[in-house]
Amino acid sequence: EIRLSLVGSEMCIRDRYTSYPTADRFTKEFGAEDFKKVLNARGTGENTADLSLYVHIPFCANVCFFCGCNKEVTKDHCRSKEYLEVLSKECELVSAEIGGNKEVVQLHFGGGSPTFLNNEEIFQVMDIIRSHFALAPDAEISIEVDPRSTPVDKVEVLAKAGFNRMSIGAVSYTHLTLPT
């Protein structure tokens, strides 16, 4: 049942903006060698813009029916273990193309729900990043959190791991709109 009284002034049509570049910009004409050239240009100084990284953690413990993001709904942490192994390899390959002379000034974890990761996995993923990339001392290190499954002790773990910003993508602050 749709309760229009809860929707109110939010009833309007908007573009779905969930990534940059948007999905329609990806083509088969841009292949692996093109990607390597772009990464290499980042490391050789041809592109002097600050380096920012986005890490996608696609796992969610529960489905949110309003979400259009790339996600896998699971409670099985064997899936995240496998994913972190592949993420480590990808970081190794990307950092080899970029080289070690660029500092990361911004690191963002999105998803899915990155706080799906257990405490050990949170530290593991940060170790993976730090082993392949130099984080600037004042880097913004942010993570999207699901407030329904992020207790205070998890926030403390995030801070200890180095996160200094949280993004709470609240759809609503009323339990009537977003039941748990």
Segments predicted by a language model, with ranges:
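Short Fe-S-cluster ligation motifs
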Residues: K89-L107
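Single conserved hydrophobic/aromatic residue that forms the stacking wall/gate
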Residues: E1-G8, I13, H175-T180
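Radical SAM/AdoMet-radical enzyme domain recognition
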Residues: N101-V105, N118-L178
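Canonical Radical SAM [4Fe-4S] cluster-binding loop centered on the CxxxCxxC motif
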Residues: N47-L84, L176
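Glycine-rich beta-strand-to-loop/alpha-helix junction loops that act as flexible
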Residues: H108-P114
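Flexible, acidic/Gly-rich N-terminal and inter-domain linker regions that tether
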Residues: G8-E10, R14-S52
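Glycine-rich anion/phosphate-binding loops
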Residues: E82-V86, S149-T150
